[in-house]
Amino acid sequence: MSLTGWFTEDFTLAELKQLKARERIPQYRTANTQYNDQFEIPTLDEIIDLAAKHYQKTGKIIGLYLETKHPTNFQKQNLAMEDTLLKTLSKYQYSRDIAPIY
């Protein structure tokens, strides 16, 4: 199958940080559209930092549910993400047995 268009791998992180998040299917999740264009697309480091700040403020643990999208496609382009993902998780001690990651 051949796909055309723009993909994350076509951009640098600096370029991606200029974009704002939008609801992908507004016809089904209309309530989410109130947040359109309000937030940057976060990096994993930023999400982990946000979870840590929430814990410090409230004492409530926020778990991470990560999903890599189309990893074989990225591998074919020599952009495998698994090692980088594992290094990032390890940096924040999410490699422990009790880490709230799913």
Residue ranges of predicted features:
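Metal-dependent phosphodiesterase/phospholipase catalytic core, i.e.
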Residues: 1-102
